Amino acid sequence: MKFIDEARIEAIAGNGGNGSASFRREKFVPFGGPDGGDGGRGGSVFAVADRNINTLIDFRYAKKHVARNGENGRGSDCYGAAGDDVTLRMPVGTLITDMDTGELIADLTEHGQKVCLAEGGMGGWGNLHFKSSTNRAPRQQVDGKPGERRMLKLELKVLADVGLLGMPNAGKSTFISHISNARPKVADYPFTTLHPNLGVVRVDHEQSFVVADIPGLIEGAAEGAGLGHQFLRHLQRTGLLLHIVDLAPFDEAVDPVAEAKAIVNELKKYDETLYDKPRWLVLNKLDVVPEEERATRVKDFIKRYKWKGPVFQISALTGDGCRELIYAIKDHLAALKAEEAAALAEPDIRLDERLHNVDHDGHEQ
């Protein structure tokens, strides 16, 4: 299935039904009084996050989503039926923005999360509501309210734990296909990867994490060159970035250090928060480098690149070094989750301390 990560739709809620101005008509009841019912509520348009959907392609072709109007009220105090709601199923990770105001309406981060995109109009009152001691035969009624109408922009940010960075042909697709269940297209020409790929890496029966591979970046990507800039937003939710570098390019004139610096510069131009994420250096294609030259080439790269963070040496093709990298990622993600859990627990601890400082009469000490 084609991966679509952006779409524009129009959500149109139903109008509320009009209230009825009706009077009770019955034999031997000459002054039956008002009995006009209210109009029904207009249908609303909802979005629901569904983990079984991974693309916005359906919304490229179905752009207008209209809920039904509420029915008008009738006599005999009959209320109009409410209009049917429309529910749109979207991938987990979808951002929904109002195109007219720029307001972020929803960020669908959990399966089953439901949000109202356009609210249906309220039904109007029938004349039964206007009866009083001074107005025994009211003829006024209220029309239903119009439903909301919104132009919406949908953006999908994939929910991955680890994101892969690198130039085209750095070996990202080969790496993700070796360590996970993903099977991206792999070939010896640039931009083989044209859309993001997700792979689930199973460390054991109980532990796994998700890796996102995006099209390779080139210099000028932040200004729109190449393909990768379109998909950099998919890395914003990750907890770790792996910067994969081709240490043995086919073209001997290509400098791996210059290419690595170019990637980091593009990352910084695009988003400072993305640049500040934890980032590991992964030196790939060591199987192509003669064994006696490996240590020298790696040492020279790190020195010229001025890198002080974690470094991993792998061959995505043969799998050398991949196992050690996978377990290091697992430990890093576990530490991140532990930090998040501790941060969430802190307010509860402060609350407990405050409760212990209250005397028997309910006054704080």
UniProtKB/Swiss-Prot annotation:
Residues reported in the UniProt entry to bind Mg(2+): 173, 193
Entry similarity comment: Belongs to the TRAFAC class OBG-HflX-like GTPase superfamily. OBG GTPase family.
BP-aspect Gene Ontology terms: ribosome biogenesis
EC number: 3.6.5.-
Function per UniProt: An essential GTPase which binds GTP, GDP and possibly (p)ppGpp with moderate affinity, with high nucleotide exchange rates and a fairly low GTP hydrolysis rate. Plays a role in control of the cell cycle, stress response, ribosome biogenesis and in those bacteria that undergo differentiation, in morphogenesis control.
Keyword annotations from UniProtKB, A to Z: Cytoplasm, GTP-binding, Hydrolase, Magnesium, Metal-binding, Nucleotide-binding
A Pfam cross-reference name: MMR_HSR1
Binding site for GTP: 166-173, 191-195, 213-216, 284-287, 315-317
UniProt name for this protein: GTPase Obg
An annotated Gene Ontology molecular function: GTPase activity
Compartments in which it is found: Cytoplasm
One annotated Gene Ontology cellular component of this protein: cytoplasm
Quaternary data: Monomer.
Database matches in CDD domains: Obg (cd01898)
Coiled-coil spans in chain: none
Obg domain ranges (all copies): 1-159
